[in-house]
Amino acid sequence: MRHGVAWALLVAAALGLGARGVRGAVALADFYPFGAERGDAVTPKQDDGGSGLRPLSVPFPFFGAEHSGLYVNNNGIISFLKEVSQFTPVAFPIAKDRCVVAAFWADVDNRRAGDVYYREATDPAMLRRATEDVRHYFPELLDFNATWVFVATWYRVTFFGGSSSSPVNTFQTVLITDGKLSFTIFNYESIVWTTGTHASSGGNATGLGGIAAQAGFNAGDGQRYFSIPGSRTADMAEVETTTNVGVPGRWAFRIDDAQVRVGGCGHTTSVCLALRPCLNGGKCIDDCVTGNPSYTCSCLSGFTGRRCHLDVNECASQPCQNGGTCTHGINSFRCQCPAGFGGPTCETAQSPCDTKECQHGGQCQVENGSAVCVCQAGYTGAACEMDVDDCSPDPCLNGGSCVDLVGNYTCLCAEPFKGLRCETGDHPVPDACLSAPCHNGGTCVDADQGYVCECPEGFMGLDCRERVPDDCECRNGGRCLGANTTLCQCPLGFFGLLCEFEITAMPCNMNTQCPDGGYCMEHGGSYLCVCHTDHNASHSLPSPCDSDPCFNGGSCDAHDDSYTCECPRGFHGKHCEKARPHLCSSGPCRNGGTCKEAGGEYHCSCPYRFTGRHCEIGKPDSCASGPCHNGGTCFHYIGKYKCDCPPGFSGRHCEIAPSPCFRSPCVNGGTCEDRDTDFFCHCQAGYMGRRCQAEVDCGPPEEVKHATLRFNGTRLGAVALYACDRGYSLSAPSRIRVCQPHGVWSEPPQCLEIDECRSQPCLHGGSCQDRVAGYLCLCSTGYEGAHCELERDECRAHPCRNGGSCRNLPGAYVCRCPAGFVGVHCETEVDACDSSPCQHGGRCESGGGAYLCVCPESFFGYHCETVSDPCFSSPCGGRGYCLASNGSHSCTCKVGYTGEDCAKELFPPTALKMERVEESGVSISWNPPNGPAARQMLDGYAVTYVSSDGSYRRTDFVDRTRSSHQLQALAAGRAYNISVFSVKRNSNNKNDISRPAVLLARTRPRPVEGFEVTNVTASTISVQWALHRIRHATVSGVRVSIRHPEALRDQATDVDRSVDRFTFRALLPGKRYTIQLTTLSGLRGEEHPTESLATAPTHVWTRPLPPANLTAARVTATSAHVVWDAPTPGSLLEAYVINVTTSQSTKSRYVPNGKLASYTVRDLLPGRRYQLSVIAVQSTELGPQHSEPAHLYIITSPRDGADRRWHQGGHHPRVLKNRPPPARLPELRLLNDHSAPETPTQPPRFSELVDGRGRVSARFGGSPSKAATVRSQPTASAQLENMEEAPKRVSLALQLPEHGSKDIGNVPGNCSENPCQNGGTCVPGADAHSCDCGPGFKGRRCELACIKVSRPCTRLFSETKAFPVWEGGVCHHVYKRVYRVHQDICFKESCESTSLKKTPNRKQSKSQTLEKS
């Protein structure tokens, strides 16, 4: 019995408290962190505004679809696909893609108070909290790990219509996802208002009443949704006391799937399964308040209450407008609209004219509540469907026949009668009033030419048939001649369309004479003559020629209303007013003829052999053949002629037609104007076109907004009539437009809306709103109706609660309450236990309008009507779920328990760790559960591994004897959630599992591809690699590392995956480095980053430093001696490469001496420019490594000016040096080329200047077979002229004598013994002498005779460098590049000593000879 009572008490507590089992709210400290200090963005302070579209960094799943953006709306709602600015909430479900998550959808106004914050969050603290919340509220998802959170917070916001001192609410929406599953959490701190004060919401000044806030979420398909209980009712003011997760003010849902899943603790007894308390299709939700089970009913649309037992009164929000009466239905309402309004909520103003159709341009008007058609002239009938017979009675006189027209008639008169009614003729007409032509009481007055009808007030027209419209605009006493037109009959002295112009002088009273005494008629300020029948009609108006406008005897020719003058000879001008100039001034006489004038003519006196009027005929007569056409006159000249063309023609033979206007192309009185090769016609009034051939046509007139249009034509004088639509009136300037002479219509009218509120139709203080063709009365409190003429029904506000019905009384109402409720408004609930509903001795307890039966032992149910089952005593406890079957029970154990009644705890493995990580696999190990008993229960382990994006999931079963496992076939660089469970097999094929031991592991990513070294300098090494778009999809970065052999560790740098190259800088020259690359997957610590296997070590030597301070120490005509800084001690250099480059070729010398600091380049040509490059070579295990070249530019000395000598008698020569500074290039010139020769012819010059050692020091132009002899010692530089044939080769240089009597034979280093052999020239020095050898000899004393022997050899040309590297036929691989082979001729030098041979002495001569060497 104790168990039954305990269970009943729990159920009683659940039913008594419902969703409000625990009072309270979520404190701000328990909200997810928010605010500006957290980096939140804030929505604009705008009524019904929001954040606009906010792109998301990860897609968010919602009802089976992924969304990449969302909107944070100020009105308490997060929406996908589109922004939601609607402020009055709509009951879920909603269609039309309204995908929304609404914590509190209401009319929020953040302009008055509060802020709306929002942000994305991926920081570890937020993700950890979100993960813990989801795992707690959804215990079946213990492997869930949040990767993204979105937080939106409405902080201290008030309602529309409120102020800064109005009540404020604070609530929050949290979105959570791991990329596959998604959840939302609602947090409510303080909810004190529910509704805005807008008319459609209906809230009061405190933010309560009307249509309250909606909470929940909606899929947007009109079917799938969830509404938090109490949505759109007054219960939303206490939503902070409700929950579905055991925390008052907090709701949690999973929202990624096609079906809604509601959160719960999952460890309490289900009240919903036991009682099923929700009615009318409401969904029951178990709350998990520890020790106090309760439930919440989520009602279908149209129902409310704790158990969804109350039908929502949709009329409470007063949806019917304009005085409509609301009738309540189930989840619906219907509005009965008053007269003049329609639509679902009586929102549309209606008029009797909406269904009335008037024909033939008739206008509908409302008169006394009915629609009446006001017809256009000529039509009648209820719908203007009948044409008025204007010929009844017959208005035509004197036997004329009447033809009926629309709104008019015309008379076909018999001879000799005419006039509008055939009233004019040759015979006296009887009294025209005898036929009583005037209608509607009009008085007929007989006139000379007929009759005139004087119409009574309200009528007009020729016969008083037409009713005067209310808006007749005729001025100065004018009468309107037709309805809906502005045609005025003006009184005497006025004219114009509206009789607006006064005639100051009557034209017919100013002695105006009409031809043959015709009758004068005033017309528009002018006059017209009505001629007698037998008078010529052309005299009805004066002729333009009547004033004799042509002078000097010119004749006038009239053309309609214009004229032209034909002038006599000698005059011209429009009126023949101008005299022509002297006839002879134009020189008409040809061929030297003399012109004489007489009597207005001229005469030509022709010279000999010419005749003719203009002396144009000669012999022979060229005009005899008649070459001039079109009447041209031929003038004869000697052997030729010229045509004098008549007016209008031109050309050599007058063959060119006249000007365009010559043929008078303009018709209908148009005036022609010549325009180059074309003409232009100035047309008379009423005509248009290129030749004035068409009458003026204005085309159809344009439409005017809010007006209908009628027009009688498009020609000159045609009239267009505009009639404003119902609800609009004419403003300016006129309703009539006239087709004007220049082919356009006159200014159009305007139709402006009529203010129907001007008459103040609303009664009892109601305010009037103007509408098109109508008005709307907004009634004051207590009145209603179209004009606020009715007193309001107090029951319309639905004051009765809990389903009570209202009865209206004069100035009051009374509520009839349903069973269970009493009070003035049925607000008090009666004791539900009065009916004794409990069976089998159950005790009834009431509360909150409901009751609960506390059942005795062995009975349960809502009324204790059901016999107890085996699960009543909860044999499975809180460790499993009990299932009854055939009087027995079975337990389905929860995670961590096993055994028959789930009484044994199943322990998980411990010390789960990672042993090895590879690209496609992971090795893990663990320890079995502690204790022999715990191990005895085990049947094995379940190893589950799931990829972080959920795309891969697998579970392996591992035998109990093993404590490690290899996870295979994994993707490279991918993160996996690994869970290991202890497993106990059951006989019912359902295994019990322990809580998991979890581990997050990531496989190694793939290494880079295509790694290579792209460039090496003395201080940098550049490398590049490639990442494949698919194979390296999980790679987030690349780590490049380098190590010097003497360094203790690598120097590593991480670069982004988008980078594919890197340069190591600040390296030491000539050193060996080791380079390796690895890829990285996952950068942050929480992502468990891994690194790929490194690439194979790549050894790279940096280049050695190039030679420093390269300079030219000495430059001669054929050699250059260069020096540079010696290598530092310990240098690994093994050789140098010297490149000699001209503009045509490059030669290289390989010098295998790494300690070299100078080098002499020989075999150069005098006066040439060279580029010298020196490259240092270092030997490595990878082959020779070369430095960058050091460059030097030189110009060799010319022959003359390098070394100058003069040989005199027995004295030894003294060499004068002309050596330039080492840093400058030599600039050698011909010594004696400064003065011009004495004779005009330049004498031949020598071709070479040879020094004492037989070396060419300068080359010049000249004859190669000539020589110059210098006869005496020059006082200045010798001028080498007077070239002679030389009998033999002489190798001498210019020599100068020694000065003084000093004995130079004993000077050290002198040349007194002439030690040089083979013609070598001795050069004395300070301490020693040197020999300057001739061609073909070498050695210190020129003792070696050398010859060069050619032989074929192979030269290698670099594909990347332009210069081959070779020395004496031996190729040196200076660059580690690809070479191509080229066959060439090389020279090998062979030398032989001549010391045993006697060298002939040189013969001294008093004269010195210079010869080509």
Curated annotation (Swiss-Prot):
Pfam families from the UniProt entry: EGF (PF00008), fn3 (PF00041), hEGF (PF12661), NIDO (PF06119)
Subcellular localization, as worded in the UniProt entry: Secreted, Extracellular space, Extracellular matrix
Positions of the EGF-like domain: 268-309, 311-347, 349-385, 387-423, 429-465, 468-500, 541-577, 580-616, 619-655, 657-693, 753-789, 791-827, 829-865, 867-903, 1307-1343
Domain Fibronectin type-III: 908-1006, 1007-1105, 1106-1200
GO biological process: cell-matrix adhesion
Post-translational modifications: Phosphorylated on serine and threonine residues.
Domain NIDO, first and last residues per copy: 103-258
SUPFAM superfamilies in alphabetical order: Complement control module/SCR domain, EGF/Laminin, Fibronectin type III
Biased composition (Basic residues): 1207-1217
Name recorded for this polypeptide: Sushi, nidogen and EGF-like domain-containing protein 1
Species, as recorded: Homo sapiens
